[in-house]
Design a protein with these regions (language model features):
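Non-heme Fe(II) oxygenase metal-center motifs and adjacent flexible, charged/small-residue loops
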Residues: 1-207
Length: 207
């Protein structure tokens, strides 16, 4: 099990919501934020909205073990090889969450206009009850969760520099989450969501 002493920040109880937060988990967050901003080969993907291609409102990069392709929003991401920095952060988050990770989606929110809409990390390659470890670096942003059937009030968390949030169990099946836009002047935020790809394609493979 995860180290309960790490996850001391209470999350409002809600049905089938298995979320825990470790405030200030990453003591050397400043160093890693600065490094990721300059080392990461950021790209801005596109999605189709009402038949039109539009850029997503954030920058991103996908890293992972060989064969860990990831499909979301109609896009297929091929993994970049682990860097020394990301492998270290992966191992630290895996130890805290007491689970293994083989991939990470790195998102860069440049201003308060960058965001991600309501969604669940429920793609088939993540399995039925995925564990997602979300590491926040940089500006504090508001993270919201809501039940898909709207049977419970939304849960709102302000995620700060160095915080680690872990979602597990039925959370992805029954809840959605988002990072909303804000009109407040905020600095840059980098978020790393570590996950495990079930049955990744072998090296050089695809489908």
């Amino acid at each position: 099990m995860a180290d309960r002493a790490l996850f001391h920040s209470p999350v409002p109880p809600a049905p089938d919501l298995e979320v825990e937060v470790s405030r200030g988990f990453l003591a050397d967050a400043d160093e890693h934020l600065a490094g990721l901003l300059v080392e990461t080969p950021w790209t801005q993907g596109e999605i189709t909205v009402f038949g039109q291609r539009r850029p997503i409102p954030r920058l991103e990069a996908w890293y992972g073990d060989p064969g860990c392709t990831y499909t979301y929003s109609g896009r297929l991401l091929e993994p970049l090889p682990w860097t020394e920095r990301l492998a270290d952060l992966r191992d630290r988050c895996a130890d805290a969450a007491d689970t293994a990770f083989d991939s990470v989606l790195v998102n860069r929110y440049r201003t308060g206009d960058d965001a991600v809409g309501w969604h669940s990390d429920d793609e088939p390659e993540l399995g039925q009850r995925p564990v997602i470890a979300s590491l926040s670096l940089g500006a504090t942003r508001r993270f919201r969760l809501r039940r898909r059937d709207r049977s419970h009030d939304p849960v709102v968390l302000d995620l700060e520099h160095g915080d680690l949030l872990v979602m597990r169990g039925p959370t992805q099946a029954l809840w959605e989450h988002c990072l909303t836009r804000t009109a407040r002047p905020v600095g840059e935020r980098v978020n790393l969501t570590f996950r495990w790809i079930v049955n990744p394609f072998p090296t050089g493979g695809g489908g």
